Amino acid sequence: MIDSLTTLMIYFFLPVSYLLVGFVIMYYTREAFKKHMLENMVSPMWQNYVFVMILLIWPFFLFLVVTTTILKLFKAVVN
C-alpha cells in the first residue's frame, strides 16, 4: 500500500515542482516564444493572453503524464 509520505509527494510536491520548472522555462524563453511563435499565429492584442494561458496550462499536462506514469509504476511494484 502507498504510504502517506508518497501520497503527499505525488499530490503536492510533484505539481508544485512542475509548475515552478514550467514557469522558469517559460520566463527565460518568453521573448523568443512571443517573437517566433505568437507573432505569426495571433494578433498583437491577444498575444499576452495566449502566452499566459499557455504558461498556466502546459505544466499541468506534463504533471499528468508523469504522475500517471509514477502511479502505474507504484501499482506494478505493490502488486
Curated annotation (Swiss-Prot):
Membrane topology field: Multi-pass membrane protein
Keywords: Host membrane, Membrane, Transmembrane, Transmembrane helix
Membrane-traversing stretches: 8-28, 50-70
Main location: host cell
Recorded superkingdom: Viruses
Subcellular location: Host membrane
One of the record's GO cellular component terms: host cell membrane
Official protein name in the record: Putative transmembrane protein ORF17
Biological source species: His1 virus (isolate Australia/Victoria)
